[in-house]
Amino acid sequence: MIYQGKAITVKALESGIVELKFDLKGESVNKFNRLTLNELRQAVDAIQADASVKGVIVSSGKDVFIVGADITEFVDNFKLPEAELVAGNLEANRIFNAFEDLEVPTVAAISGIALGGGLEMCLAADYRVMSTSAKIGLPEVKLGIYPGFGGTVRLPRLIGSDNAIEWIAAGKENRAEDALKVGAVDAVVAPELLMAGALDLVKRAISGELDYKAKRQPKLEKLKLNAIEQMMAFETAKGFVAGQAGPNYPAPVEAIKTIQKAANFGRDKALEVEAAGFAKLAKTSVAESLIGLFLNDQELKRKAKAHDEIAHDAKQAAVLGAGIMGGGIAYQSAVKGTPILMKDIREEAIQLGLNEASKLLGNRVEKGRLTPAKMAEALNAIRPTLSYGDFANVDIVVEAVVENPKVKQAVLAEVETQVKDDAILASNTSTISINLLAKALKRPENFVGMHFFNPVHMMPLVEVIRGEKSSEVAVATTVAYAKKMGKNPIVVNDCPGFLVNRVLFPYFGGFAKLVSAGVDFVRIDKVMEKFGWPMGPAYLMDVVGIDTGHHGRDVMAEGFPDRMKDERRSAVDALYEANRLGQKNGKGFYAYETDKRGKPKKVADASVLDVLKPIVFEQREVTDEDIINWMMIPLCLETVRCLEDGIVETAAEADMGLVYGIGFPPFRGGALRYIDSIGVAEFVALADQYADLGPLYHPTAKLREMAKNGQRFFN
């Protein structure tokens, strides 16, 4: 053994060839933490000191190569002064440079996934051989930063600036055939032939058949583009990427600027440019929020995994109520491998559900994400039925009938008599109390809520609602089924609206107050979209459905009359009474036409102003900042109340619920991180400025206490 550490070993293979293997003890994946970087330095030193070494193969002892840097270390690192961050990056890059500058040929054998620093390690090698099942990429822009271990320097010099910009700015994982096509890897082999392929390459380099020094040289030099080519490549890319990323996500454009600035430099000077830009991005609030989001997501996965121990495996599912929602649930279950019965009392609803599932599967086939054979397999896994004949072997039933408590109670009581005693019943409800629905059941311990968001196939969140009598096994089994469906489940306790809708309706309440104060809803939409929401509140209400919003608001007002009940008519009342229901009937706040692709397209409709006129009670002068505060303060304060009331267990889950469930701007991190970014004391003072708008704007006593003590939601 030439070197042995806790993350890296170097051992002799044959004929002077050594294997530098990453295998971080106590972890399921390899990552570049402080320990691994330090050991890489020692391992490279050991190789340099051993005159018998003729070639090096870099490999992994795990199913994946290296997933990148240890993101948990970013939180403290990024608090350092900018100059220290630059120095730290340059120090790390000296290790990669030392590996790249070894006097012997080097080959990276890429298995599983090599992301971020993992791919940057491979780029420092002379040759790369990749398993057919492996994926590689530089996803750092998703964290608000860009590659900092030489990725912006080596990749464009290997595969050309256009390809490198596409890889870095998109942050996507790339398959083996695509990597080979652009020259990011030198060979692609079957997984079982990976080591043999790496050995073949290194032996050919040692023998002189391959000139590894010539292969290495372009990575050490400036980019091979003249001034005109540079201008065309970089200016065009910056314009396009800025349009794609938007103003709230600076990292993709900054990555292009860095490649451009470093284009005329050799490796070492180019790495200095990279380090300086990386440090600037690392200090932004966007990076802080997106890294926080990543860590929150890991916390969500950890909590969901904790349920596995007692969860029953749902081998056979059923959905009650077909149609669009039932069809979407059936599709999601079947395509992820759990066969499902789809029951309705009407043949036309069954057909609608099957059509929905078939359409979604067909779309995946068209996009190359599913083979026709897999589509047929998924369709066969959906069994339509008008009766309960096959329900005896069902492990979990998702009830997705109309949002009416009496109807749901009747259907749930009926299906309970048709399933085995330990089958789980889950109601897909957005607002109705799980405790109320449970009263109709003989086995309420087997009952939970399972709130899917529309459209089911696109929305990543599922709220699993624990009722007073729900057993931990019922909760765990439902969480496990949601995970099998490819969803991100969050367990919440029962209350009107659960987490997401309870928080969303105060936001809509702020919107209603603005419209009643004479503020143009189109202006409100523009301001909130600029703030970072995927769509403004008026457009969102049209998409959700004015009738759905009207019903939801009434449920919330009944549940929280002290702050959510408004005695005055609102914009939603006016539109509902005028039968302007949004996209579903072609007119709401906006009117809707069908575009060339058959999708609804919003257009202005002056007639809505007459409908809204009776509910405009005053004409207030408000700034864009006021609009944001009228909307965001109620949403944030209701999130705080949900955490304080124990509806959601952690701040991480609360924030991820809003990002996944209603499209809260990811670069702002979630409602509680947004409060942190303002400062808890500053947020309380801000809310107090709007206290005259009503109880939705009044901070809780506990939040005032946090403000007084200088506390945060995230440390």
Swiss-Prot record:
Residues 1-190 are annotated as: Enoyl-CoA hydratase/isomerase. PROSITE patterns: 3HCDH, ENOYL_COA_HYDRATASE. It holds the Pfam family 3HCDH. Its EC number is 4.2.1.17, 5.1.2.3, 5.3.3.8, 1.1.1.35. InterPro entries: 3-OHacyl-CoA_DH_CS (IPR006180), 3-OHacyl-CoA_DH_NAD-bd (IPR006176), 3HC_DH_C (IPR006108), 6-PGluconate_DH-like_C_sf (IPR008927), ClpP/crotonase-like_dom_sf (IPR029045), Enoyl-CoA_hyd/isom_CS (IPR018376), Enoyl-CoA_hydra/iso (IPR001753), FA_oxidation_alpha_subunit (IPR050136). Residues 312-715 are annotated as: 3-hydroxyacyl-CoA dehydrogenase. Pathway: Lipid metabolism; fatty acid beta-oxidation. Gene3D superfamilies: 1.10.1040.50, 2-enoyl-CoA Hydratase, Chain A, domain 1, NAD(P)-binding Rossmann-like Domain. Keywords: Fatty acid metabolism, Isomerase, Lipid degradation, Lipid metabolism, Lyase, Multifunctional enzyme, NAD, Oxidoreductase. The active site is at H451 (for 3-hydroxyacyl-coa dehydrogenase activity). NAD(+) binds at M325, D344, V401, V402, E403, K408, S430, N454. It catalyses: a (3S)-3-hydroxyacyl-CoA + NAD(+) = a 3-oxoacyl-CoA + NADH + H(+); a (3S)-3-hydroxyacyl-CoA = a (2E)-enoyl-CoA + H2O; a 4-saturated-(3S)-3-hydroxyacyl-CoA = a (3E)-enoyl-CoA + H2O; (3S)-3-hydroxybutanoyl-CoA = (3R)-3-hydroxybutanoyl-CoA. The record marks E120, E140 as: Important for catalytic activity. One of its GO terms (biological process) is fatty acid beta-oxidation. Substrate binds at D297, N501, Y660. GO terms for cellular component: fatty acid beta-oxidation multienzyme complex. CDD domains: crotonase-like. GO terms for molecular function: 3-hydroxybutyryl-CoA epimerase activity; delta(3)-delta(2)-enoyl-CoA isomerase activity; enoyl-CoA hydratase activity; long-chain-3-hydroxyacyl-CoA dehydrogenase activity; NAD+ binding. Involved in the aerobic and anaerobic degradation of long-chain fatty acids via beta-oxidation cycle. Catalyzes the formation of 3-oxoacyl-CoA from enoyl-CoA via L-3-hydroxyacyl-CoA. It can also use D-3-hydroxyacyl-CoA and cis-3-enoyl-CoA as substrate. NCBIfam families: FadB, PRK11730.1. In the N-terminal section; belongs to the enoyl-CoA hydratase/isomerase family. In the C-terminal section; belongs to the 3-hydroxyacyl-CoA dehydrogenase family. Heterotetramer of two alpha chains (FadB) and two beta chains (FadA). This is Fatty acid oxidation complex subunit alpha. The gene is fadB.
